[in-house]
């Protein structure tokens, strides 16, 4: 009976411990095994990550809206990421805010690891997402007469390093 009572008390205290630990965490380091899940969690619960340091490796990617405004992002490619309703591959990451030079995207539409890779440290600018209206594509990869809205959080970059040896990084991430 005492063992059962101790287990019950432990189970009741576990959520408090988890909440207490996660609220006090000041930084997140996304790596190959955590990138997709943590990035997805950030997209759903951005308020939990504002003012927390986030470190991650990504490649640069331009998103152009229907008015030809460009957004330079730091992303990874994934299947059915946050906000994806099409069931096709998409990208997950942030719009980058940085005072210095950011490498131009390289092979962003190609299924290759040969990209413009960067190592970033920074924080979410806010929990507000930027809505970007983009052209939709048909099954053949041609621009259709439809548009769709994608949403990205903005990331204030405090440190950026170019990654020259990206052999241990995967442009495509999943669960």
Where do the PLM segments sit?
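OB-fold and OB-like single-stranded nucleic-acid-recognition modules
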Residues: 21-175
